From Swiss-Prot:
GO CC, any one term: plasma membrane
BP terms from Gene Ontology: carbohydrate metabolic process; pentose-phosphate shunt
Family that this chain belongs to: Belongs to the glucosamine/galactosamine-6-phosphate isomerase family. 6-phosphogluconolactonase subfamily.
Pathway note: Carbohydrate degradation; pentose phosphate pathway; D-ribulose 5-phosphate from D-glucose 6-phosphate (oxidative stage): step 2/3
Short name of one Pfam family: Glucosamine_iso
Name recorded for this polypeptide: 6-phosphogluconolactonase
Gene: pgl
Substrates-to-products reaction catalysed: 6-phospho-D-glucono-1,5-lactone + H2O = 6-phospho-D-gluconate + H(+)
GO molecular function: 6-phosphogluconolactonase activity
Length: 247
């Protein structure tokens, strides 16, 4: 397992570099295993990356790509807060990916209504169905992540029950400190099944958490510290986010 850091002048250059790398990673996964399993993230950089992929759509063999989500806001299907809705606008409406290879999390006005726990369990079943027999989740090729100023990733917040989860792949979050409060999230054990984990982080408000996570903080306190890939962990930072790393 390796870990590396790349620093860029600004978030636009960061996103373009991440997008170019992801196009290559998808191609390599398809060549090696016949498919590419990618976990998407929301946030400014995550959605900008999807717009980059849309512009480079001809370089990707979409019939071989499966898309998952690291977390989702448990709001109605058409709510602008939905990561899925943002992903549709940025990418999915513009590429020819089979609908059964897009694996979104449930919405609050969907099959499970207000039952957040049932929605989380259902996504665990989605992951298991996409995994090798007997495995709880796939070995994702790339899990994309953003990070909050306190070090949260997906909807795993510091000192929360979700970040403490050690066995389940997906859990419900009903008291997120960042609105909306009700969410579904992949856990650290699910993230750690990924071959590669990429963290795209920009802005001066993230510098302390970046330094803590890379410096080996307890993931309970800084969840991003637990975002580790089986083969590679890649931090893609702008200069502001990297400002407090040792020189």
């Amino acid at each position: 397992m390796s870990s590396s850091i790349e620093i860029f002048p600004d978030s636009d250059i960061l996103v373009a570099a991440a997008g170019k790398r992801l196009v290559g990673a998808i191609g390599a996964a398809v060549a090696a295993r016949g498919q590419a399993l990618i976990v998407l993230t929301g946030g400014g950089n995550g959605i900008a990356l999807l717009r980059y992929l849309s512009a480079q759509a001809q370089q990707i063999e979409w019939s071989k790509v499966h898309l998952f989500w690291g977390d989702e806001r448990y709001v109605p299907e058409d709510d602008d807060e939905r990561n899925l809705k943002q992903a549709r606008r940025a990418l999915l409406n513009h590429v020819d990916i089979p609908s059964n290879q897009v694996h979104p999390m449930a919405a609050s006005d969907g099959d499970f209504g207000g039952d957040l726990d049932a929605a989380a369990l259902a996504y665990e079943q989605v992951l298991a169905a996409s995994a090798a027999p007997g495995d709880p989740a796939p070995n994702f090729d790339v899990h994309l992540l953003g990070m909050g100023p306190e070090g949260h990733i997906n909807s795993l917040f510091p000192h929360s029950p979700a970040v403490l989860e050690s066995t389940r792949m997906v859990v419900a979050v009903d008291d997120s400190p960042k609105p909306p409060p009700r969410r579904i999230t992949l856990t650290l054990p699910a993230i750690q099944r990924s071959r590669e984990v990429w963290l795209l982080v920009s802005g001066p408000g993230k510098a302390d958490a970046v330094a803590a996570a890379i410096g080996g903080a307890d993931p309970v306190s800084v969840p991003a510290a637990g975002a580790v890939g089986r083969q590679n962990t890649l931090w893609l930072l702008d200069r502001d986010a990297a400002a407090k790393l040792p020189s």
